[in-house]
Regions:
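Double-stranded beta-helix
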Residues: 141-201
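Non-heme Fe(II)-dependent double-stranded beta-helix
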Residues: 1-15, 20-115, 120-124, 161
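Short hydrophobic-aromatic micro-motifs
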Residues: 19-20, 132, 201
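Internal hydrophobic scaffold segments of catalytic domains
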Residues: 25-38, 136-158
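Short, conserved beta-strand element in jelly-roll/cupin
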Residues: 90, 123-141, 194-197
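Glycine-rich, charged/polar anion/phosphate-binding loops
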Residues: 117-120, 133-134, 187-189
Length: 201
């Protein structure tokens, strides 16, 4: 089971991220994997941005190929107490699920997500929120793991630039359209988020 300890909560507040010590239960992990695979199989032509809100029939105005039952599967995952109980340890008892996203990065596609702060994409004030990222495969520096810059959340919202997502030859070179101005942070301070399938950060 996932388990965020009191020391993990303090680490989250200090560093801006935490990796769960435990793993999702086999039942919940299989439920996520089944919903994820069905969604990807039906929508494999979509960009990363277009894979937002799989729990809503008309999420973000996107035209997903999905059934009402699949939406309900994602919604039930997002409301699952195994996940929500850990979020409550960080944010408190009054929490809502306001978004979900399937991040599908196929091998050898080169879809790099630029350095960013999640809050720049969220029209929410105050930004008393957190992301729960669940790995469905083992992830390390060799297959595109996330990276964090410890304590950068204490710097407030850093300047972001609009990223040109298309190369001169017309190829898509990345995902998401905002990136932190390189003058605002030191990438050498980053930490690789290496986790096993079924873990969460």
């Amino acid at each position: 089971m996932l388990n965020i300890s009191s020391s993990d909560v303090e680490s989250y507040k200090e560093n801006g991220f935490v990796v769960s010590e435990g793993h999702l239960s086999t039942e919940l992990f299989n439920e996520i994997l089944q919903a994820y695979n069905e969604f990807i199989d039906k929508n494999n032509d979509l960009s990363l941005e277009e894979m937002a809100s799989p729990h809503l029939m008309n999420g973000a105005g996107l035209k997903h190929n999905k059934s009402k039952e699949l939406c309900e599967s994602f919604l039930n995952i997002g409301k699952n107490n195994e996940i929500v109980s850990q979020v409550m340890k960080i944010l408190g008892d009054d929490v809502i699920l306001w978004g979900m996203h399937c991040m599908h990065k196929e091998a050898k596609t080169g879809k790099k997500i630029p350095w960013h702060q999640d809050g720049t994409y969220w029209p929410i004030e105050p930004k008393a929120t957190c992301s729960v990222w669940i790995a469905i495969t083992d992830v390390d520096e060799n297959n595109g793991c996330m990276k964090f810059i410890p304590k950068s959340h204490k710097l407030g919202v850093l300047p972001h630039l609009q990223e040109d997502k298309v190369t001169n030859d017309g190829e898509l070179k990345g995902s998401l359209d905002l990136k932190i101005d390189e003058k605002s942070f030191d990438e050498n301070e980053s930490i690789n988020c290496i986790i096993k399938k079924g873990q969460a950060s």
